[in-house]
Swiss-Prot record:
Stored InterPro entries: 4Fe4S_Fe-S-bd, 4Fe4S_Fe_S_CS, NADH_quinone_OxRdtase_chainI, NDHI
Organism per entry: Nymphaea alba
Protein known as: NAD(P)H-quinone oxidoreductase subunit I, chloroplastic
Enzyme class: translocase
Assembly and interaction partners: NDH is composed of at least 16 different subunits, 5 of which are encoded in the nucleus.
Encoding gene per record: ndhI
Residues holding [4Fe-4S] cluster 2: 74, 104, 107, 110
Length: 179
């Protein structure tokens, strides 16, 4: 007789425990119901990238000393640096610099270890093309600065926080919007 009673008690405890778990998960589901939607209409609305976002690499040809530190610290030896040794002044002269963004993993080591700060990360993330050979950027393509998403009047940016008061005296940048 007692084993049957303990079996019913165990069944009752398991039923109560299951109902509690279902109730807890239902409460979590309901708590997400009052949040704002996360989906944005991408080509027309763009989210503002963070300050530390690793986008396309910007290269300044005049600052580069062809030391090849960027190639040595790159985990996949990606940047291609072509240089010639000028014997009269005994310095390297940079001829060509290119990065293939189809292979780049955007780790940022080249930017971090560059001694002359000729490399920097931009907020540009739209690098998609139909031909993978178009992702091989030379020093001319790397030297172009992308148009800022914040300053682009054709795109409506999505601010992740609630209404932010921005004074029009200061220029818009990612720091004034996120603060």
């Amino acid at each position: 007789m007692f084993p049957m009673v303990t079996g019913f008690m165990n069944y009752g405890q398991q039923t109560v425990r299951a109902a509690r778990y279902i109730g807890q998960s239902f409460m979590i589901t309901l708590s997400h119901a009052n949040r704002l939607p996360v989906t944005i209409q991408y080509p027309y609305e763009k989210s503002i990238t963070s300050e530390r976002f690793r986008g396309r690499i910007h290269f300044e040809f005049d600052k580069c000393i062809a030391c090849e530190v960027c190639v040595r610290v790159c985990p996949i030896d990606l940047p291609v640096v072509d240089w010639r040794l000028e014997t009269d002044i005994r310095k390297k002269r940079l001829l060509n610099y290119s990065i293939d963004f189809g292979i780049c993993i955007f780790c940022g080591n080249c930017v971090e270890y560059c001694p002359t700060n000729c490399l920097s990360m931009t907020e540009e993330y739209e690098l998609s093309t139909y031909d993978r050979h178009e992702l091989n950027y030379n020093q001319i393509a790397l030297g172009r600065l992308p148009m800022s998403v914040i300053g682009d009047y054709t795109v409506r940016t999505i601010m992740n926080s609630t209404q932010i008061k921005i004074s029009m005296d200061k220029p818009l940048d990612s720091r004034t919007i996120t603060n």
